[in-house]
Amino acid sequence: MALLDIVTYPAPILGKPCKLIEDIDEDLVCLVEDMTETLYDAPGLGLAAVQVGVDKAMLVYDVAEDENSESTGLKVLINPKIVHTEGKVTSENEGCLSVPEFRADVPRFACVTVEGVDHEGKPVKIDAEGLLAIVLQHEIDHLEGKLFIDRISSLKRSMYKRRVAKALKAEG
């Protein structure tokens, strides 16, 4: 296993939809292991393959069901898609490993149903609410070429983009 570099905004790959995975092979299993190590090292709740520079529709996540419960353990979703949404909620103080040092309130669905396959190719259907629903929406957004800053007000988004541009210019 190896720690992978996390790609950060404004890297172009983060703005492009990911390719669907057709075969689960040894390389993909290695990628899952490396992404897992990277997720826990970061630390984060979820990590999409695109966030480590890999153009594949896959994500890993580990979310406790609520504040009082332990981790549910690592889960892998390949080619996930949201097939049902319900209700509205604001994800307060949402952040992202690919958008460092910035947090914002983000409009999300309160409940989602997600379908995909696991790392063994078995079909998976997840009915999620609360934090899990937010994490799944956030990570699936990555696979569709969207960042959470694409879902906030244009004023807040432009302030962040200016700050990043200024920092990049200062780095030379």
Swiss-Prot record:
Transmembrane regions listed in the UniProt entry: none
Catalytic center residues: E139
Annotated binding of Fe cation, by residue: C96, H138, H142
MF-aspect GO terms: metal ion binding; peptide deformylase activity
Cofactor(s) in the UniProt record: Fe(2+)
Biological role stated in the UniProt entry: Removes the formyl group from the N-terminal Met of newly synthesized proteins. Requires at least a dipeptide for an efficient rate of reaction. N-terminal L-methionine is a prerequisite for activity but the enzyme has broad specificity at other positions.
Protein name according to UniProt: Peptide deformylase
Species lineage: Bacteria, Pseudomonadati, Thermodesulfobacteriota, Desulfobacteria, Desulfobacterales
